[in-house]
Amino acid sequence: HAKYFKLYHYAKGITLLEVDMTTDTARKPETVDSGKENAKTEAADSQELTGTEKLYMGNVVKYLIVPEGAVIPAGLDKDVIVINQPVESAYVASTDALNILDKLDLTDKVTALGMEKEDCTVDSLTAALEDGSVTFAGKDEDTDYKALVKSQCGISILSSDILPTEEADTEAKENLLKDSAEKYSTLKIPFCR
């Protein structure tokens, strides 16, 4: 039983991944009552966000993982963030995610990192940073989006540090999340924590 996500498998190898963005964070899950009270504020806030950006701001972010050649129903991409497989190029700014990719022998897909070589825990990627085959593309609010475009990044895996862990951090972290959602959506690069 997973604490942070749910997986649903469908025909043709399509998978829906639902990620809970409230567990172990200061973000509060919406309830029916709070939804009614905050409807006007949220409506004003959501008018600033467009399409995919809104999907990243919800309590649950839904990713539809689509194998090469599979076709999804028209309009479904308005309700989910589509990740097309195979992913050939990834930006990783999470040490935990990087270690998992290393154990799965998938670090060859990493073309940009959100950590400098002295912070990188994977030897092959430290060497790749040194020889220039992997780019340091900044981290968190200092991400170099031009470097991500140049590396033809197909997905960004961010640290959960982008989410607030204490009540005092909530507004600043929500603004960082909103800014990231806007920029990644503009570049059409799906991101997850």
Pin down the residues of each PLM region.
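Extreme N-terminal leader/targeting regions
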Residues: 1-56, 166-167, 172
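A short, structured surface patch at a secondary-structure boundary
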Residues: 13-15, 24, 50-172, 182
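Charged, glycine-enriched surface loops/patches
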Residues: 167-193
